[in-house]
Amino acid sequence: MLSPKRTKFRKQHRGRMRGVASKGNTIAFGQFALQAQDCGWVTARQIEASRRAMTRYIKRGGQIWIRIFPDKPVTMRPAETRMGSGKGNPEFWVAVVKPGRILFEMGGEDITEETAKEAMRLAQYKLPVKTKFISIDKNLEVSSQENTKNSKKSQEEVKQ
């Protein structure tokens, strides 16, 4: 499971989740992605369960990128202990997720949109935040570039 190799401090405050994600909110590596709609904490176990679900579905077809990392320690007190006597020990690690954050990306030549959508749907069930499937349509980018070239040619023809 994911966790930092070393940290400056063992324990952290809980903090609050306000606003939307300003970093990590665009697709950087693959063609398809899972984007968070809510805010919440995603544990290292949930990230691993989602990764396994996607990997098992796509088999050896493509590649998966995990765009979040659990770097926040969550502490817990032992059961049936009295109040006081300090903060509990770190039990697990979480990634703080804000709306708009890309959680997972998927790509590869063998991956179709239907395959990616189904794999991401399986991963969605393992996560505590509401998510949506997004994709980059390569054909639209190519066609828009071709249209700009064609429009430049037509403008030159009109000038002559």
UniProtKB/Swiss-Prot annotation:
Name the keywords, alphabetized: Ribonucleoprotein, Ribosomal protein, RNA-binding, rRNA-binding, tRNA-binding
Write out the GO MF terms.
rRNA binding; structural constituent of ribosome; tRNA binding
* InterPro entries with a match to the protein in the record: Ribosomal_uL16, Ribosomal_uL16_bact-type, Ribosomal_uL16_CS, Ribosomal_uL16_dom, Ribosomal_uL16_sf
The record's Pfam families line, in alphabetical order, gives: Ribosomal_L16 (PF00252)
Q: A GO term (biological process) for this protein?
A: translation
- Gene Ontology cellular-component terms listed: ribonucleoprotein complex; ribosome
Parts forming coiled coils: none
What is known about its subunit structure? Answer: Part of the 50S ribosomal subunit.
Q: What PANTHER family does the database record attribute to this sequence? A: 50S/60S RIBOSOMAL PROTEIN L16 (PTHR12220), LARGE RIBOSOMAL SUBUNIT PROTEIN UL16M (PTHR12220:SF13)
Function of the molecule = Binds 23S rRNA and is also seen to make contacts with the A and possibly P site tRNAs.
UniProt lists the family membership as follows: Belongs to the universal ribosomal protein uL16 family.
Task: Report what the protein is called.
Answer: Large ribosomal subunit protein uL16
Species per Swiss-Prot/TrEMBL record = Prochlorococcus marinus (strain MIT 9301)
